[in-house]
Amino acid sequence: TLADGSKFVASVYGLSGSGKSTLTHAKHNGKYPAIKVLHDDAFIINTDTCASIALEPTYFDKTADYPTGCPDNKYLLSCQNCSATMDEDGKIQLVTEDIRNGNGRAIKSKLWSPNRVDKIESPVNAIFWIMKDPTIPPVIKLKGSSLAAVMGATLATKTSTAERVKAGTDLNALRIVPYANPFRTYPLANDYEKFKKLVEEKNVACYIINTGDFMGKKVKPADTLGILETIVEGKAKFEKWGPFEDMEIMPWGDFEVNLNDKDYTAQLKNAMQNRLTSVEKFATDKGGYDKLPDDAVAAIKKVVDEAAAL
């Protein structure tokens, strides 16, 4: 809720370790009259009313950032991949911070978040795809429903410590996880069409946020939160990004998007080509189970063709 009483509902999508919980639970130094948090993991959006509903009454959180004795830990209901020890007073204490083994987790009460709600009636205003892709500027605004939806379907990120990976996996290699949901049990086109509808029929805005590095320079949480606040407050000024017709960028801090840097443009072309290749593979892998409509292929191919001019 903003100072003028208007509401802005942001829907954020990213894998574990991408920064989505940091964005979700940020207090923004108390500058807004009210912040309501639906959930930082599992929720659905009604594509007719654009209201949002949480799917879980609790949180399933990493314990790596919450030291033993931390006051937040009193909200933990059960723990996994953690151990326990006895302190000098004979009390049992939880051992967190991934000391015993990696990916310590806990079921955390929703009471941990004082501003937590189970439903947001106000319609969603914007979708944010969170990526850790070093070719993506700190923020991009996507125009057109097909491009907005296909960029979510080709959400690229680095593997984090929150995930089990095969031995030998390159943790710096980008991989694509559609809509940041590795647990989908239905055809990918279902999600694609729903996100497309939100943008096309419900006028929901769509952005990509890079929470990793941009060409060697770290995008800090303060940058990302500042970008989010600028958008929420209606102060964001986006401008044309080189040859791209449907992607706009907003200058931020000292992040320089230099399209005359051949090393950068080569990596950018490669990153966009990888997205096109992924969409094309959806049509053949698993017998075409995750095939996307032709407009999805056309939208990302247009970006690849535009990038070729660089």
Predicted regions and their residues:
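Conserved nucleotide-sensing/catalytic segment adjacent to the nucleotide-binding pocket
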Residues: 33-106
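Short, well-ordered loop/turn elements at secondary-structure boundaries
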Residues: 5-7, 31-33, 38-40, 47-49, ...
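Flexible loop/turn segments at secondary-structure boundaries
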Residues: 18-21, 44-47, 61, 135-137, ...
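Structured core elements
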Residues: 11, 39, 44, 54, ...
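Conserved NTP phosphate-binding and transfer environment spanning the P-loop NTPase/kinase superfamily
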Residues: 83-310
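Glycine-rich phosphate-binding P-loop
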Residues: 5-31
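Conserved, well-ordered active-site substructure
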Residues: 9-11, 27, 49-64, 218-236
